[in-house]
Amino acid sequence: MKNIDIKEDEEGGSVSELIEAKIQALNDWRGETLARVRALIKQADPDVIEELKWRGVPVWSHAGIICTGETYKNAVKMTFAKGAALEDPSGLFNASLDGNTRRAIDIHEGERIDEDALKALIRATVTLNTSV
């Protein structure tokens, strides 16, 4: 199976519009949560690159993948590609804790996002990505 990656075009159009359409199509708490996560990522790293990978999964990158934004029936999952290498003083990581590389945050309906802690985690990921 061929993997198709779509990166932001220079005018800021295609990928942003596709991610926005995905958010709108969800039309429930998952769309609202994904939209909020997306906004926080952009606040934490204004230079972030948005991509779509793996059959339409939003991916945010800066010198490497920061995280993905997957949606499931009962959760919005943010998977950090290098999460195991990050400090998580606020304890945001609550999924994929046993692996040697990735860590994830599962956000369920009604849960509050610790916005400051999430932005700090995004910035730490960018620092890690740019230091390699």
Task: Enumerate the predicted regions with their spans.
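Charge-dense, helix-prone N-terminal extensions
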Residues: 1-132
